């Protein structure tokens, strides 16, 4: 494989990390006590020229775990009725088991050693995902235990905006406020935003890194 082809590979772009975009909707801010209600995940891939793009998607409504807190303010904010049978909710175990399986498959195909979570204000999504995985007894968690790519920080650097909707608009992307706070829609927008920031850096000449030539 040529050096150029290697640099256009996903594993070499992020030092062996496999980026996966995640968004969660919850019944509060405390990952240990408040319910995880919805989660979506989108894997990413690179074409032969090194341009990053969304790949596979999974989306689940999630049943609150036994004894979970359901904060009324959080439910009013995201508009989720946890008791609605039409949600088709699944257990935390089933949702995360399916997502982790998809992620591990993508890691293997991309020759990556570890998944890294991409999320907007990533500490929140990371904490709920990792806590739910531990609570569900899932042993093969592919995500790095603390390293993330936070699109709020990246957007502040690249676009001068930190709010997801404003960052998307600044990047030239449409944003439908009526669909915001759906885990699927927010994950789709975050994935497109992350890809645009990474690809914009490439277009500006920031990647591949210049190779120092001996004098």
Swiss-Prot record:
Q: Which cofactor does it need?
A: Mg(2+)
* E.C. no: 3.1.13.-
Residues crossing the lipid bilayer are: none
List the protein's name.
Ribonuclease T
Binding, Mg(2+) 2: 23, 25, 181, 186
Q: How does it assemble?
A: Homodimer.
Q: Which family does it belong to?
A: Belongs to the RNase T family.
Which terms under GO biological process does the entry name?
DNA replication proofreading; tRNA processing
CDD domains from the UniProt entry: RNaseT (cd06134)
Residues marked Important for substrate binding and specificity (site): 29, 77, 124, 146
Coding gene?
Answer: rnt
Q: Which organism is it from?
A: Klebsiella pneumoniae subsp. pneumoniae (strain ATCC 700721 / MGH 78578)
Exonuclease domain location is 20-194
């Amino acid at each position: 494989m040529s050096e150029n082809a290697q640099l256009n590979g996903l594993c070499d772009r992020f030092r062996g990390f496999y980026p996966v975009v995640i968004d969660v909707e919850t019944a509060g801010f405390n990952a240990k006590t408040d319910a995880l209600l919805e989660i979506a995940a989108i894997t990413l891939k690179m074409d032969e020229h090194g341009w990053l793009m969304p790949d596979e998607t999974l989306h689940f409504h999630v049943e609150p775990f036994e004894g979970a807190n359901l904060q009324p303010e959080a439910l009013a904010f995201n508009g989720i009725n946890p008791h609605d049978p039409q949600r088709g909710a699944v257990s935390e175990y089933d949702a995360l088991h399916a997502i982790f399986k998809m992620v591990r498959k993508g890691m293997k195909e991309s020759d990556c050693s570890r998944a890294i979570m991409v999320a907007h204000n990533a500490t929140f999504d990371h904490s709920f995902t990792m806590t739910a995985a531990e609570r569900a007894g899932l042993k093969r968690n592919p995500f790095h235990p603390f390293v993330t790519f936070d699109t709020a920080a990246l957007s502040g650097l690249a676009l001068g905006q930190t709010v997801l909707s404003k960052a998307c608009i600044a990047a030239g992307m449409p944003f439908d406020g009526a669909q915001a706070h759906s885990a699927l829609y927010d994950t789709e927008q975050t994935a497109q935003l992350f890809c645009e920031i990474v690809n914009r850096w490439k277009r500006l000449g920031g990647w591949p890194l210049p190779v120092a030539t001996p004098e």
